[in-house]
């Protein structure tokens, strides 16, 4: 499929909606200062039961019953590719066995969020993504919903404690697991309120120490041009547009020579038919260790992360994220990393940049057409929880410098936001985008 210049311009400008001041690395989120419990939770179906293909409403209250919330949900059929599979590795990095990922095993939903401004009068306030872990009269679920552009993150207390930093508030301990919620606006430092911080100029940034990212001839560092002539730009320049600092030109930013100030937020030309970008994920020993060697829990966490992150791209570009390949390392970290999977090493070995380099070389050997591969780990480097190559989306092969479409994401309380920020989609992903057409929908309906 060919994509027109109109879509290219729209996609690049729309990127600024979410990827403001973006670059090749992500810092850890600020401390969580406040959490709320979900009360009066009801799944509005007969017997409060659902399955993977159900459409239903969930209602609950937050902030000590002060605010009623309704989530109107339907299945997210795109979160898993039809032929999605998981590979389980041995300690030496060789493949132990491979299994298909059955969509029916994962109750993953998308939809909208509503608030009750007066009795029986509900107002739309944003989008919603949920992964239901338990249905019935006492349900448990995790996910995210947006209320007036403030992300509300729902986690089981056990999941929250798994990623809690020393500065985060500690929810009350109870006899049984329960759901807690924190907003992005509940995350701030004592003196300044920020969300996930990304900063290129900091010389301590691990991404800046990568020779490829620091190359002054890289397209993302080229000065702005007088004309935003997309048709005259080289493919390399287009690749570089995935890094953004400022879309208005000037000293602080670079857009590969395009000034997009007048078109930020304009989605004219975006695809009318939904497209899906297929992505591969590998998890290292440290990631699985965070789940107590529970492979099912780790797999569900990755799928839930995809579900939430995809909402940003669906609403902006009409492009969804779909998990195609999942490669899982055993929980026991090797004393010496294998030559097959050199990225699988203890947190005490290497840093986030060396993990990216090793993982990218491995990614280059994979025979697939995925748009991107992500390594999930539990090993930050200082405050850095994400790193990627500049402008390398859809680059499949590795070079002598081991540069390709890959990134590293560290498990955090808001890992879905790190994941979303590090895979800015662009419209030349022709090899990895597929139409969600009528035939596909018919196959999904037949599976019910």
Regions found by a protein language model. Name each.
Residues 2-178, 347-353:
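N-terminal prosegments of processed precursors
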Residues 324-350, 399-448:
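The catalytic-center signature of Zn2+-dependent metalloproteases
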Residues 139-216, 223-225:
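Non-catalytic, regulatory and substrate/membrane-recognition segments associated with hydrolase enzymes
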Residues 6, 129-146, 300-317, 431, ...:
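Classical protein tyrosine phosphatase
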Residues 103, 301-305, 412-416:
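Short, glycine/acidic-rich beta->alpha junctions
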Residues 25-51, 189-402:
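Fold-level signature of zinc-dependent metallopeptidase catalytic domains
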């Amino acid at each position: 499929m060919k994509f027109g210049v109109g879509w290219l311009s729209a996609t690049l400008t729309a990127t600024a909606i979410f990827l403001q001041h973006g670059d090749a690395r992500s810092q850890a989120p600020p401390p969580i200062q406040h959490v709320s419990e979900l009360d009066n939770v009801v799944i509005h179906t007969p017997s409060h039961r659902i399955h993977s293909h159900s459409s239903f409403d969930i209602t609950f209250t937050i902030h000590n019953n002060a605010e009623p919330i309704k989530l109107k949900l339907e299945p997210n059929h795109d979160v898993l590719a039809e032929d999605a599979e998981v590979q389980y590795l041995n300690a030496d990095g060789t493949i132990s066995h491979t299994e298909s990922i059955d969509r029916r095993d994962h109750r993953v939903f998308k939809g909208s969020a509503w608030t009750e401004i007066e009795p029986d009068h509900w107002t739309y306030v944003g989008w919603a993504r949920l992964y239901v872990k338990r249905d019935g009269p006492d349900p448990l679920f995790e996910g995210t919903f947006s209320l007036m552009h403030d992300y509300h993150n729902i986690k089981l207390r056990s999941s929250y404690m798994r990623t809690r930093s020393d500065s985060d508030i500690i929810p009350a301990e109870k006899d049984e697991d329960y759901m807690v919620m924190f907003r992005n606006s509940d995350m701030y430092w004592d003196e300044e309120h920020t969300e996930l911080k990304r900063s290129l100029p900091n010389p301590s940034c691990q991404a800046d120490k990568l020779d490829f990212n620091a190359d002054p001839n890289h397209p993302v560092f080229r000065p702005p041009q007088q004309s935003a002539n997309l048709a005259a730009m080289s493919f390399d320049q287009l690749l570089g547009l995935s890094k953004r600092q400022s879309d208005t030109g000037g000293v602080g930013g670079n857009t590969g020579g395009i000034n997009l100030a007048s078109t930020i937020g304009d989605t004219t030309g975006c695809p009318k038919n939904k497209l899906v970008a297929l992505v591969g994920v590998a998890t290292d020993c440290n990631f699985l260790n965070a789940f107590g060697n529970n492979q099912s829990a780790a797999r569900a966490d990755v799928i839930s992360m995809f579900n939430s992150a995809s909402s940003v791209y669906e609403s902006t570009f009409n492009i969804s994220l779909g998990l195609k390949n999942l490669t899982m390392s055993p929980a026991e970290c090797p004393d010496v990393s294998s030559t097959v999977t050199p990225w699988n090493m203890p947190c005490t070995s290497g840093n986030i940049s060396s993990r990216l380099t090793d993982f990218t070389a491995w990614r280059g050997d994979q025979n697939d057409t995925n748009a991107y591969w992500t390594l999930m780990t539990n090993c930050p480097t200082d405050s850095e929880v994400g790193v990627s190559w500049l402008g390398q989306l859809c680059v499949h092969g590795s070079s002598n410098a081991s540069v390709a479409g890959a990134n590293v994401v560290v498990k955090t309380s808001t890992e879905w936001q790190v994941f979303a920020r590090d895979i800015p989609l662009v419209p030349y992903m022709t090899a990895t985008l597929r139409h969600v057409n009528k035939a596909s929908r018919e196959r999904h309906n037949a599976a019910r």
